[in-house]
Amino acid sequence: MSDLPPILDGWFAARGWTPRRHQLAMLDAARAGKSALLVAPTGAGKTLAGFLPSLVELIERPTEGLHTLYVSPLKALAVDIQRNLMTPIEEMGLAIRVETRTGDTSSDKKARQRIKPPQMLLTTPESLSLLLSYPESAAMFSTLRTIVIDEVHAFAPSKRGDLLSLCMARLQRLAPDMRRVALSATVADPTLYRGWLSGDGEIDRVALVEGDAGADPDIAILLPLGRVPWAGHSGRYAAEQVMQQIAAHTTSIIFCNTRSLAELIFQDLWAVNEQHLPIGIHHGSLDREARERAEGAMADGKLRALVATASLDLGVDWGNVDLVVQMGAPKGSSRLLQRIGRANHRLDEPSKALIVPGNRFEYLEAQAALDAVEAGERDPDVFRAGALDVLAQHIMALAASAPFTRAAMLAEVREAAPYSTLPEETFDRVLGFVATGGYALRAYDRYQRIVEGPDGLWRVAHPRFIAQHRLNAGIIVEAAMLTVRFRNGRSLGRVEEGFAASLSPKDTFFFSGLSLEVEGVKGEDLFVRATSRPARIPTYGGARMPISTNLADRVRHFLHEPEQWPRFPPDVREWLEAQRQRSILPAPDRLLIETFPREGRHYMVCYSFEGWNAHQSLGMLVTRRMETAGLQPIGFVASDYAIATYSLKPVTDPAALFSADILDNEFVDWVQQSSLLKRAFREVAVIGGLVERQHPGKRKTGRQVSFSTDLIYDVLRRYEPEHLLLEAAWEDAKARMTDVGRLGRLLDTAAERIEHVDLERVSPLAVPVLVLIGREKVAAGTSEDALLIEAEALVAEAMGRPPESTPSPY
């Protein structure tokens, strides 16, 4: 076991602490010259474990120059870590400088850091990539000994992970002895992450350090005072019960799966906050100052509750939080664990959490998540080949720092795990794209960013391309947004341009915890004033969070195993029993499809459990095929668990609608004709550097960016359909926007194992998804009564009884 320097040993002793086993194991790995992946629960001291070898080295051999680079998924987390690191450094009187470098860092400080860096620099992948675009980067990183990647699960399987992996390959060239360290609490397959971290797949070079298990979390499902609702996915019915829990605890975080739901829940809680407890709201669309105020109030213990989204999933260390509430189903066991970890943030004390299911299917999902956490099961991560638009951006960044040869660049790129098997021909296509923009665009000087000289070295064609790159580099491409403002200029945050376009003067909507009335749109601003009138909720774009495959499998098994049912509330058991009597229950290895007439329409419900994204895609494809078959489809709705189509003519042969060739025919046509591919192209065009978001002193509006990318998209589709970025956009549209992998699995099941049940009326299991048809027709936030009436009528039909005279929400 590693010995600590006396000054560090004394610091632990003065606090009454003893270094944990995994913290010393990280020091052992460092002394053996090995990289390391640390997997340990929240509150186990992962951050200190990651930095401990660096502190020891700097105590034993003080040096100037950059020693340790820390990479975080969030700017706020980097700032938080700086504060936490400075405590032991100052208490031990160590001459170690720790600084952050993010988009919020001043240009003067950034310039100084390039010449005289601190010993420890805390940053994000995007800021690191920009730093590598400067000629000074070679000297700056030559002294680097360690890179520490926090919350690695938030990076590795994504485009940000591709960028970070490429950056690590460059850093390893500049500092050959650099060690790589990654930290996480929620890794399902450490072998995959060790391979990603190693770069070359040699996982034996990466030690796996596992922390001791902490106290088992205290998780419960909050049941309503009445019955579990048939429909909805928000848990809004439980506002009073949640408020009681807030009052009974010191500080609570109320997690919601969407920003719009966070606004609704905040309003619901405020309406029943009879004790006038201080409650805040935090999500990614709010103004930065509003988010920082909420974070500061939480850190100071001034709030009793904070309603939040995924913006607070990672790394927040507020020790006074003693309750986490998950509104609606958590969608994955890893996400639930991550959120539970926000409570107590101490290893030896159980984190307390409540799950508030939105409906009966979500009750099953909540129980599945609880069981998965208990069993130590994590959601699997899907690693894929590196994105080509990210590679194009990286090549441009390195060209800005120094000339390079093709052979050296290819070899270096292949040292990044996502690109380790990159074909030479594909690399040449990416290099050619950076050099000319592609065949159809090569006549335009603006796309000829790098040129090869007679000496075989590639250089940037003109200094303006370097400035252009640094202004526009980044992986996160936001949708076109408008700033929400009061007339006095105060900014509340941003909403999507599409939502703003649906509003007229005097329309109302909830935002930033306020009810707002639209006054008008001017330029990039949506002007509003406060109002007390009822309000809608902004609809935020992007894919919804789908249920994980692990939880979906557990829910399937619940349905198929009646011996599990005694664990469930009486009304959930009654629901499943009624389904078993009136139809059949879905089996894990079969695809149940029900058809039935209702009110002059013909319905088909498919219980596929592949998540909302895949179901949305399949709904579009199946209704297209129904149209071709002359079934006169009217529409469809999708949930995480099922798809329901409704048409004027009945479906008699569902197998024909679900054949696997739908991915070769209708899928290709649909994606190419829909806005999906254009949206994906917009993102890859910005990331790949084909279109700029910013010029010196001026930022393009979302509409201007969309116009530019749509124009180029049409040109390339016509004149160069094999263009690199069209290929990249197609891959994005398939994998991220349509979840084509899960779609394929669904169709494979359907190929041989469809169970078709033709019914005289709606089944009990179909009620939750059919209620969504009513939800599609009415504005969010104003539809509850209408939906309750619709749900009651459907329940009455499914159960074979007359509807109650007074609709019940349960």
Task: State what each model feature region is.
Residues 30, 476-478, 503, 510:
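Short, well-ordered loop/turn sites that connect or cap secondary structure elements
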